[in-house]
Amino acid sequence: MSDVKSVIESGRAVLGIEFGSTRIKAVLIGEDHAPIATGAHDWENMLVDGIWTYSLDMIWEGISDCYSKMAQDAKEKYGVTIKKLAAIGISGMMHGYLPFDKEDNLLVPFRTWRNTITGEAAAELTEVLGFNIPQRWSIAHLYQAILNKEEHVSKISYFTTLAGYIHWQLTGEKVMGVGEASGMFPIDSKTRDYDAAMLDKFAALDKVKEYPWDIRDILPKVLTAGEKAGTLTEEGAKRLDVSGNLESGILLAPPEGDAGTGMVATNSVAVRTGNVSAGTSVFAMVVLEKALKAVHEELDMVTTPSGDAVAMVHCNNCTSDLNAWVGLFKEFSELFGMDIDMNDIYGKLYNNALTADKDGGGLVAFNLFSGEPVIGLNEGRPMFARKPDARMNLANFMRTHLYASLATLKIGCDILFKEEKVKVDTLYGHGGLFKTKGVGQSILAAAMDAPVAVMETAGEGGPWGMAVLAAYMVNKVDGEPLEKYLSDRVFNGEKGIVMQPDPDDVKGFDEYINTYKAAIEAERAMVKALPL
């Protein structure tokens, strides 16, 4: 403890703060990268005039409350007041739209990534640029405002994301980490900067030429992990620490997005690695050796914090339907007066699923509480069906629902692995699906036909990943790449428990997916038949 105290007192600790959609979290780490103090502030987006937003006041109240709780935690644990830090890093939800005029006034309320209001712009830009531009990307928001002839557009001097805005206010620097920038505008992984040819194509659009600004001048400057991104100003220090104890002059890392910090937190920034986060929603991110051959609307292209290309498959639904069925079995046990721990119920049901027929026995389930763009559905209805000759038993039932939780992810990833022939050495699994040891892991390995590792220490998540990126900036030696720093100095060679795909499981999941795809028409009919 005295060691930690001296690390804080001498200003050697590093701080990461991440703005999630419901929680802002600060993690302070020591020289071994382990968390030593944390603080959190809950917040909720608001729907104002049909736009999902957070006010600027909410941002600053949130970050100062979060910081003061972290500082209080450090004081209570170690009896020390934080005055200096080795480095700070800010991360947040990617994408969205924060445009400012030349006097630095916000021109319209912050439009977050949740707003699906840019369909026309996203489709047109995808065609013009020959690159998939999802609706939540900043450039789609800007172009939609142009198509809508919104009067604020002519006044834009700078536009940025949430993390980019906070970093700018703390340092005065209009910069951004490459991973975060890749959610604003496409990145060229060779130059680790915005794609020059695509900038030219955007600037040449007739509707864009009507405005006085050049797209290159209003985007943030791109930096890669390890570069210095400015220092905390006196004004910035006061905004972060309202008690006035924190000194100015602290180095800041390039602000990053939640995708990049998640890659760092799971040690999956190296080429041919990836990570799968499976909870209420599910996504897979795979670091590519080279650019993809074709444009796929199912795949979002972003980058690691170092600028390597990453393909991402994001699905809205994962464990909610599974959890509902497990809850039903809990109720059944209570009818018999049994008080069984939920973890035991999950354990028994999930492990029993491993004894099932490899294809699920002819049962099929859709776990869709909401729409799923990967299979072309704007809405979803949870649904379970079977053929009359299907082998209906508990093991097949549970295996079918485990398959269903990853079915849309598999359809998206099959494009990556089967059509694009992308190779992956290891996928790191994290999230609720992997809580029951070995089960979610083996189902994911079957879905992806790839080795899946689960860390014994499920990482501390995004804010910790951001703190690690800030530590990398101040600790790295010349020429030390981020992936080496993570493997050697942060994860200390820990590879986690790796599970290879079982060929019979892979074949079984492929057979299940064929049934699932054939039944998508029934799911579509169900959405129509049961309107909300």
Language-model-detected regions and their locations in the chain:
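Short beta-strand-loop/turn "lid" adjacent to the catalytic site in phosphate-handling enzymes
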Residues: 75-112, 132-134, 167-179, 183-188, ...
